[in-house]
């Protein structure tokens, strides 16, 4: 049989590719993508977007969006104290992508990316790591116990 040179990606429709990619995204997966105001990320120095690491917390009940928290190198000193307290340190000794420095998950700022947008930004090199189930439980706890959390949003993504 002659090989046509087509890949699975060539054969699948855009909708099918989106479904395959989105269904492969799991709680605890870490990605690095160029995010913008659509995901609640503000650019720096005149840029409209920023490359950010983030950890997936879940899919919404309709399968249309992914919930996530941003992972930062430091806690923004301009945040209110209540939000600073909801940053969970993740240890570089557990995760190679941190390159020897502990980073922080901002559990006070639950963000959403549409499935369509995620697929649009996705490539296999964007996947960086998997956060341990112990750390995911800590992240969820911090998010749930944040007094200003959007309860409706947390419920939509299965945290409540």
Stretch-by-stretch model annotation:
Residues 1-4, 59-61:
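Secondary-structure boundary elements
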Residues 2, 88-160:
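C-terminal terminal-subdomain/extension
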Residues 2-25:
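Mixed-charge, Lys/Arg-rich low-complexity intrinsically disordered regions
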Residues 41-94:
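Compact nucleic-acid interaction/catalytic patches
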């Amino acid at each position: 049989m002659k090989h046509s040179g087509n890949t699975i990606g060539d054969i699948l429709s855009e909708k099918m590719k989106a479904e395959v990619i989105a269904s492969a995204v799991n709680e605890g997966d870490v990605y690095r993508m160029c995010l913008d105001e659509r995901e609640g990320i503000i650019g720096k120095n005149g840029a409209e977007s920023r490359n950010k690491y983030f950890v997936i917390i879940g899919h919404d009940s309709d399968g249309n969006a992914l919930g996530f928290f941003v992972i930062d190198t430091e806690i923004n000193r301009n945040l209110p104290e209540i939000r600073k307290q909801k940053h969970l340190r993740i240890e570089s000794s557990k995760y190679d992508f941190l390159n020897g420095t502990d980073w922080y998950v901002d559990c006070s700022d639950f963000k959403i990316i549409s499935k369509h947008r995620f697929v649009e930004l996705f490539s296999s090199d964007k996947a960086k790591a998997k956060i341990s189930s112990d750390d995911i439980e800590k992240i969820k706890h911090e998010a749930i116990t944040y007094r200003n959390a959007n309860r409706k949003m947390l419920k939509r993504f299965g945290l409540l």
